UniProtKB/Swiss-Prot annotation:
Native source species: Haloquadratum walsbyi (strain DSM 16790 / HBSQ001)
Keyword 4Fe-4S: no
Cysteines paired by S-S bonds: none
Key words of the record: Coenzyme A biosynthesis, GTP-binding, Kinase, Nucleotide-binding, Transferase
UniProt function note: Catalyzes the GTP-dependent phosphorylation of the 3'-hydroxyl group of dephosphocoenzyme A to form coenzyme A (CoA).
Catalytic activity: 3'-dephospho-CoA + GTP = GDP + CoA + H(+)
Binding positions for GTP per the UniProt entry: D43, I44, V45, D62, E120, D143
Similarity comment: family membership: Belongs to the GTP-dependent DPCK family.
Pathway: Cofactor biosynthesis; coenzyme A biosynthesis
Entry EC no(s): 2.7.1.237
Name used for this protein in its record: GTP-dependent dephospho-CoA kinase
GO MF annotations, alphabetized: GTP binding; kinase activity
GO biological process: coenzyme A biosynthetic process
GTP-binding listed as a keyword: yes
Length: 186
């Protein structure tokens, strides 16, 4: 039986403190450098992309930034996606629902907003695993900017290794995402 959700053990928390890629404060420069499609994780990152009229292929939001509710301007801007998937995902975990929503979203031709009841902070990890090589996953680094992760075999391996170290059934998570243990599509 699956032991999901996966939980982030305290021994692994430090590895998520440093950015997994270059940090940007200029959205236009980020878009110049980013491969497509783009998966955005975080309300403020998604909002900043939309302020320059760019809608990411997939956005994962939870209505919060730095553990506080986002303001009404951000909420209003984030309501403009073609399709919405609502999921539950508790803080410090990666739920079955989040994994399945990411898998569905990357296969959907129109933009998809995954709205998380709980916390989306760890969604970056499975987002890289399901993303198309050459694409980009972007997430917010508090008080620094937006972090660009180029989706490459190397970044998939990095995220795969982190996922394997989480508490729970990592093999079941890989299966739900439709990827093998190295992060490659099955």
């Amino acid at each position: 039986m699956d032991r999901l959700p996966l939980e982030l053990p305290s021994s692994l928390r430090q590895e998520f403190k440093s950015p997994f890629g270059p940090v940007y404060t200029d959205v236009t420069q980020f878009l110049t450098d980013a491969g497509r499609p783009i998966i955005a994780v975080g309300d403020i990152v998604t909002y900043h992309l939309q302020t320059v009229d760019y809608t990411p292929a997939v956005a994962v939001i939870d209505g919060q930034t730095k553990r506080e509710s986002v303001d009404e301007t951000v909420k209003a801007a984030l309501s403009k996606h073609n399709k919405r998937i609502d999921v539950e995902n508790q803080p410090g975990t990666i739920s079955i629902a989040l994994l399945e929503a990411l898998q569905t979203a990357v296969e959907t031709p129109e933009s998809v907003m995954i709205v998380v009841d709980g916390e989306e902070d760890l969604a970056t990890l499975p987002a890289v695993l399901v993303a198309r090589p050459g694409g980009t996953v972007v997430y917010g680094q508090p008080d620094q900017g937006m972090v660009r992760i180029a989706v490459t075999p190397e970044t998939k391996i990095t995220m795969s290794r982190l996922l394997k170290r989480m508490d729970g059934d990592a093999a079941a998570a890989f299966d739900r995402l439709g990827v093998d243990r190295s992060g490659d599509k099955k």
